[in-house]
């Protein structure tokens, strides 16, 4: 998109309109106007004018401070901004310098794009006259980030700086949320101009599309068509994704499911959209979803997808996904997702909250059908194929740890995770009663996400219990952020489930590569995580190796006033089940030795699979 002009919107005149400011001061003033209360960032030469503007803003505004959280590195800043955005629903902001500062930010930007998280990255750039000369700490941010972000701005014209920053926020949170990058040359930050206090960049056709999406409603005839299909079904199932949470549609989802008595499965990122303790909740579906959730997908005859995209971790073999569904409905804010993977019989492009609300209103007037037989059947699935693990082992089972912790938190904590087995155990065994309480890297699967995301969530929600459930591999990736926790005295609880290796990859090697553990065994690594936590200022830093003390120590850990670190040495051979292998459908789901399967003819751990003959989905 190319900006055509700056659009002024008729509002009350800004009290600072007409005042002379530097470009850096304009950036900070727009952030203040957008309600930003926290910036996560790492300084450097090309962004120094803006950091100086933060200092001067604080000096001039005793009652209106913008908190600055300085991480160990820029990737940490990006994931902190993501954790802030995911837990609060507001736009997260991070501020970095040029060159390596910007390139260190690529992974969190891509992570936010993949999971539809609204963040704004402002990065410094070398002066305009030096761009393209391989100047010190120059990197082609526009070219690099364009493939990863929702939009990237390189500010050539300083007169457009104010409107550009304001537009970045508007874009980040509009329609399908995502990350927006603003690359600001140092001389533009030092430029002096007149602050206008209003205005957005204008893009041909963009405003019209956004207005159409905001105004979109489900027409009466489409409501009738939906309920006609629902009336012809006997086994409807709602498949809810992260879009439900992004659109704040959890209330509508719960009302819809409760009113019409339709069970709900959620994606990894949709967890919390439906209270997992609700009778209509079947929790998570997919590769490591609940067995009963996946069986319900196999058995349903009407699949209602809301804010979800049929990705490979859910749909697997697309033609075998929901094979008995005669009808498939899809509600999504992004028209590109409709029919992209799975053909549908009914669709609505628009906000999930609006779509569900319109259907709910229409259905309450005229639709009546009893799905009690299906609901009873689903409840039996939950009982017969309940989650389970080796409860007799003398080794500490990670599932037991999460179960014990869940008895303490009771679905009320904000839980973040790294990526790997611990991520799946946390998703499976925690209860989540509210949206925005389960924060994890879904599509990108970025190791190192959990700790900085927990920091961002704790900053956004200072009165909430925030727990990072991490693995030894993931925690290593951003271990430096332990110091950030104590520097700002954030009461984040870091729970490390240590199995001395990259457990999820090791599980794949066990199941599909005949126990050839190449590069995943970390038992010879000498990292003492407890000493590292103590060195970074944690007053509660402990290691647990005894099964009998799990409940007692977990309670001490959670109730400690301040940052706390607990390492638990778990069974190295514990695996995540269920598991739908690569290139397989739900009928091939492996449930392990402790979860009851309704088909014992599936492949078992130890059966080597020729990985050259199945799609590479790892």
Q: Which role fits each region the language model picked out?
A:
Residues 86, 242-329, 423, 433-463, ...:
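Glycine-rich, anion-gripping cofactor-binding loops and their flanking helix/strand elements
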Residues 87-90, 136-175, 299-300, 346, ...:
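Conserved thiamine diphosphate
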Residues 24-28, 32, 45, 50-54, ...:
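Active-site diphosphate/adenylate-binding microenvironment
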Residues 48-128, 130-137, 291-294, 299-311, 338-341, 349, 424-502, ...:
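Thiamine diphosphate
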Residues 171-232, 386-387, 589-591:
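Conformationally flexible catalytic loops at phosphate/diphosphate-handling active centers
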Residues 4-6, 123-165, 186, 270-377, ...:
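Glycine-rich, acidic loop regions that bind phosphate or pyrophosphate groups
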Residues 2-18, 159, 206-210, 214, ...:
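Phosphate/pyrophosphate-binding active-site segments
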């Amino acid at each position: 998109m190319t900006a055509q002009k700056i659009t002024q919107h008729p509002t009350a005149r800004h009290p600072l309109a007409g005042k002379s400011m530097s470009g850096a001061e304009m950036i900070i003033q727009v952030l203040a106007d957008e309600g930003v209360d926290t910036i996560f960032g790492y300084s450097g030469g090309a962004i120094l004018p803006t950091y100086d503007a933060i200092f001067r803003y604080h000096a001039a505004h005793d009652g209106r401070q913008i908190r600055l959280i300085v991480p160990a590195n820029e990737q940490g800043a990006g994931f902190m901004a993501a954790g802030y955005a995911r837990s609060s629903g507001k736009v997260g902001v991070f501020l970095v310098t040029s060159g390596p500062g910007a390139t260190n930010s690529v992974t969190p930007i891509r992570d936010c794009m993949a999971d539809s998280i609204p963040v704004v990255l402002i990065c410094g750039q070398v002066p305009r006259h030096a761009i393209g000369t391989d100047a010190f700490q120059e990197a082609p941010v526009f070219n690099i980030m364009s493939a990863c972000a929702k939009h990237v701005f390189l500010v050539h014209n300083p007169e457009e700086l104010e409107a550009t920053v304001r537009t970045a926020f508007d874009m980040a949170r509009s329609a399908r949320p995502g990350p927006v990058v603003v690359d600001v040359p140092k001389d533009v930050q030092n430029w002096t101009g007149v602050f206008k206090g209003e205005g957005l960049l204008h893009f041909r056709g963009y405003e019209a599309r956004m207005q159409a999406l905001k105004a979109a409603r489900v027409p009466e005839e489409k409501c009738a068509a939906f309920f006609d299909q629902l009336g012809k079904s006997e086994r409807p199932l709602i498949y809810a994704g992260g879009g439900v949470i992004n659109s704040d549609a959890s209330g509508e989802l719960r009302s819809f499911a409760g009113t019409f008595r339709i069970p709900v499965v959620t994606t990894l990122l949709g967890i919390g959209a439906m209270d997992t303790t609700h009778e209509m909740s079947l929790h998570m579906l997919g590769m490591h979803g609940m067995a009963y959730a996946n069986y319900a997908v196999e058995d349903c005859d009407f699949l209602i997808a809301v804010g979800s995209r049929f990705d490979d971790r859910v749909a697997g073999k697309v033609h075998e996904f929901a094979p008995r569904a005669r009808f498939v409905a899809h509600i999504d804010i992004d028209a590109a997702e409709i029919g992209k993977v799975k053909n549908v019989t009914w669709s609505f492009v628009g906000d999930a909250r609006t779509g569900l609300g319109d259907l709910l209103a229409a259905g309450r007037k005229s639709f009546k059908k009893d799905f009690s037989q299906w609901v009873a059947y689903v409840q039996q699935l939950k009982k017969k194929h309940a989650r389970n693990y080796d409860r007799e082992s003398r080794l500490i089972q990670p599932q037991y740890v999460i179960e014990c912790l869940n008895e303490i938190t009771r679905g009320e904590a904000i839980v973040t995770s790294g990526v790997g087995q611990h991520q799946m155990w946390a998703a499976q065994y925690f209860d989540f009663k509210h949206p925005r309480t389960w924060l994890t890297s879904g599509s990108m699967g970025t190791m190192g996400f959990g700790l900085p995301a927990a920091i961002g969530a704790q900053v956004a929600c200072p009165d909430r219990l925030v727990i990072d459930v991490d693995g030894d591999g993931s925690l290593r990736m951003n271990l430096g952020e332990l110091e950030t926790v104590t520097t700002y005295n954030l009461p984040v609880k870091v729970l490390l489930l240590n199995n001395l290796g990259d457990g999820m990859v090791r599980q794949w090697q066990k199941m599909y590569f005949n126990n050839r553990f190449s590069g995943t065994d970390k038992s010879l690594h000498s990292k003492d995580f407890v000493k590292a936590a103590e060195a970074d200022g944690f007053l509660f830093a402990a290691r647990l190796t005894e099964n009998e003390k799990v409940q007692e120590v977990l309670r001490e850990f959670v109730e400690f006033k301040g940052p706390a670190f607990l390492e638990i040495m778990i069974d190295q051979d514990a695996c995540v089940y269920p598991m739908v292998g690569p290139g397989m459908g739900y009928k091939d789901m492996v449930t392990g030795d402790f979860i009851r399967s309704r088909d014992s003819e599936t492949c078992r751990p130890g059966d080597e699979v020729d990985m050259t003959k199945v799609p590479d989905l790892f």
